[in-house]
Structures are given as C-alpha cells and as structure tokens.
C-alpha cells in the first residue's frame, strides 16, 4: 500500500471511530435521562400484565394516575406530602417534598417523576397536575372572546348551538335519512 492510501485509510478509520464513540456517548447520556412512563396498575402488575416487565426498585420512572380521595397526608412542619395514586386498578404511594402545583387536589390527574423506592412506593422529585382538555387560562379565554367578537363569531357559534349550526345539523340528518330509505 502506498503512503497516500495509508494516510487516507487512517483518516477514514479515525472518522468512523470518532463517530462511533460520539454515538455511544450520546446513547449513554440519553439512557441516563430516560424515565419510562407507567400507570399504577403497570407498576403493580407489569406492562401488559407481564410480571417480567415491572419496574425495578431504584429505577427512575414517571407515573400517571389520579390522586385517591382522602389519601393526601401532609406533614405540618415540612413540605412533605404523601398520597395514593391509582388508575383503574391498584394504587401506589407517592412521597414528595416540595410545593405542589396549584391544580393538585384529590380526584385530579397527576404525573409524578422520581425513583421507585419500594415495589409500590415512589419518591417523587417532581409532581405535575394534569387538567382536562377544556381548560383554558382566563386571560387567553378573554383574548379569544375579544377576537371572535370582532370577527362576528358568537358564543353559540363556538359551542355549536347557533341557529346556523342547528339548521346544518337538520339538513345533514335529512340527507342521511334520505340515503337510508
């Protein structure tokens, strides 16, 4: 092999090696920050009811569920809170020390991120309160009403209950009934 080919080969091998090392380090860093999402039922029973797919104690996970009514226990001297979270099945205990979100309350959906310290106990580092899809901050709602009013769109139009909407529904129903006969 002539010296020119050797130098090219060294450059190509060095580039491939560098890309492989960079990809490996990137994947390692990402794996350290991946928090798998589970429901309380999946923590207790395993994903797809497979006991081999339960999260391990010490694993960082995210849990989504509903706060069980009457389960919130607060420490009077600190910001420590403990509550039960469930979905349609068994519940798990979530420990959290910090200020809870304003929307946090019993019966409300939450997502907690933390470390599983026992098979059904999570020490959360972050608790997020979920709200339904109809929630809208008041400021945004007021702004939209202003814009819709200026465009000639009424509240009834937004809700689908205006006379125009009702007439359209009736026409559609008549058309469907005519096709069925």
UniProtKB/Swiss-Prot annotation:
Stretches of the chain found on the membrane's Cytoplasmic side: 1-8
Family note: Belongs to the CcmE/CycJ family.
Physiological role: Heme chaperone required for the biogenesis of c-type cytochromes. Transiently binds heme delivered by CcmC and transfers the heme to apo-cytochromes in a process facilitated by CcmF and CcmH.
Periplasmic side: 30-181
Keywords for the protein's UniProt record, in alphabetical order: Cell inner membrane, Cell membrane, Cytochrome c-type biogenesis, Heme, Iron, Membrane, Metal-binding, Signal-anchor, Transmembrane, Transmembrane helix
NCBIfam families named among the record's database cross-references: PRK13165.1, PRK13254.1-1, PRK13254.1-3
InterPro entries: CcmE, CcmE-like_sf, NA-bd_OB-fold
Transmembrane residue ranges: 9-29
Biased composition annotated in UniProt, kind: Basic and acidic residues: 135-148, 156-166
Spans annotated as Disordered: 135-166
Name this protein carries in UniProt: Cytochrome c-type biogenesis protein CcmE
Membrane topology: Single-pass type II membrane protein
Gene Ontology, cellular component aspect: plasma membrane
Location(s), subcellular: Cell inner membrane
Binding positions (heme): 131, 135
GO molecular function: heme binding; metal ion binding
GO biological process, one term: cytochrome complex assembly
Keyword Cell membrane: yes
């Amino acid at each position: 092999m002539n010296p020119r080919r050797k130098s090219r080969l060294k450059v190509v091998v060095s580039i491939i090696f560098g890309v492989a090392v960079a990809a490996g380090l990137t994947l390692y860093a990402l794996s350290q920050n991946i928090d798998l999402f589970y429901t309380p039922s999946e923590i207790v029973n395993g994903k797809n009811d497979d006991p081999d797919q339960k999260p391990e104690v010490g694993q960082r996970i995210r849990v989504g569920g509903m706060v069980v009514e009457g389960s919130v226990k607060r420490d009077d001297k600190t910001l420590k809170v403990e509550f039960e979270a469930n979905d349609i099945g068994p519940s798990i205990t979530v420990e959290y020390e910090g200020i809870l979100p304003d929307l946090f309350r019993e019966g409300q959906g939450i997502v907690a991120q933390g470390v599983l310290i026992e098979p059904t106990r999570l020490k959360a580092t972050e608790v997020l309160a979920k709200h339904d899809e109809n929630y809208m901050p008041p400021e945004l709602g007021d702004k939209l009403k202003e814009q819709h009013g200026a465009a000639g769109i009424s509240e009834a139009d937004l809700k689908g209950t205006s006379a125009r909407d009702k007439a359209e529904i009736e026409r559609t129903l008549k058309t469907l009934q005519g096709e069925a006969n």
